Amino acid sequence: MEIGISHYLTVSAILFTLGVFGIFLNRKNVIIILMSVELILLAVNINMVAFSAFLNDITGQVFALFILTVAAAEAAIGLAILVVFYRNRGSIAVEDVNMMKG
C-alpha cells in the first residue's frame, strides 16, 4: 500500500480539527490555546508540503519553512509574555489576561 496525498490530507484535517476543538473547548488555559494554535499551523504545514510534493513544486515547502520559523517565534514570545504575566499576577487564566489594561 502506497501512502498518497489523501493520507497526508487526512492527518492534516485531524490535526486541524484537534486544534480548533482545543481552542473552543478549553478557553480557560492560555497554554492549551497556544498549543492548539501550533497544531493548526502544523496542519497547514502538512497541507502545503503534501500539495508541494504532489505538484512537484518546491514553493509550498519553502512557505512551510517560513511558517515554522514564524510559529517558533510566536511560541517563544507567547510563552515569555505568559511567564512575565504569571510573575506579576500569579495566574495565567484567560479571565485574568482579559483584565489587562495598559
UniProtKB/Swiss-Prot annotation:
E.C. designation(s): 7.1.1.-
Primary localisation category: membrane
Reactions mediated catalytically: a quinone + NADH + 5 H(+)(in) = a quinol + NAD(+) + 4 H(+)(out)
Subcellular location as annotated: Cell inner membrane
Domain of life: Bacteria
Record GO biological process: ATP synthesis coupled electron transport
GO cellular component, one term: NADH dehydrogenase complex
Entries under PANTHER family matching the protein: NADH DEHYDROGENASE SUBUNIT 4L-RELATED, NADH-UBIQUINONE OXIDOREDUCTASE SUBUNIT ND4L
Protein name: NADH-quinone oxidoreductase subunit K 1
